[in-house]
Amino acid sequence: MILLHIETSTNVCSVALSEDTNCLFSTSNAEGMNHAALLSVFIAEALEVLKSADKKLDAVAVSSGPGSYTGLRIGVSTAKGLCYGYGIPLISVSTLEILTVQALNIVTDKENVLFCPMIDARRMEVYAAFYNGKGIIQREIAADIITSDSYAEQLDKQTVYFFGNGSDKLKTTLTHPNARFIDHLVPLAINMIGFAEKAFTEKQFVDTAYFEPFYLKEFHTTAKKTTPNS
């Protein structure tokens, strides 16, 4: 199977092309939210690799967030356009899973350890989930408000590795001895390959027409203003 992978959930724009588990092409740019200009160029480069090998695309995988509204909108709309144009299915991969793959490759001792990818939301808030050392989810994604006591339940029992662009907030607040931080991890398309391949094999496709990514939203609603009686 040949899959095109698109990751645009943060300020990093990333594209990869894979055949089964092998990466045929990978590129990324982390110089800011210039996805609208970069993504089409990166995809054209990937498709040129495909053309030179005289092979056809079987599906497109796109990061589903959580992440930037602008970035995800560009990535998902582009992925949908490709799926319609080629008549192929769409696969979605969680941004938090993409981050966790990288952390699992970095940490050697994974016994009694949790991995917590974090995406920055606003103020002292993040979206986070927990995975064990085998990459199996232990707590589903949730919106968390960061305090000095955050994640005490997990940290009191075991070492927890925090990473992703939301972990900087926690790093300046949390002092628990079991907290570890992996800096500078960003979601990259090349780390979507394993998830996308599994989804394709199991025919776990999303509805191209109706699929919507997990946009970052504000946690709190503003109280409705009341107009005083005149």
Where does each model-flagged region fall?
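Acyltransferase
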Residues: 182-230
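Stable alpha-helical structural segments in soluble proteins, enriched in small hydrophobic residues
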Residues: 46-50, 85, 103, 189-200
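N-terminal beta-alpha supersecondary unit
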Residues: 1-64
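Residues at secondary-structure transition points
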Residues: 30-41, 69, 73, 77, ...
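Surface "functional belts" at beta-alpha junctions
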Residues: 22, 34, 89-187, 215, ...
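DPxDG-like acidic metal-binding loop motif
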Residues: 61-95
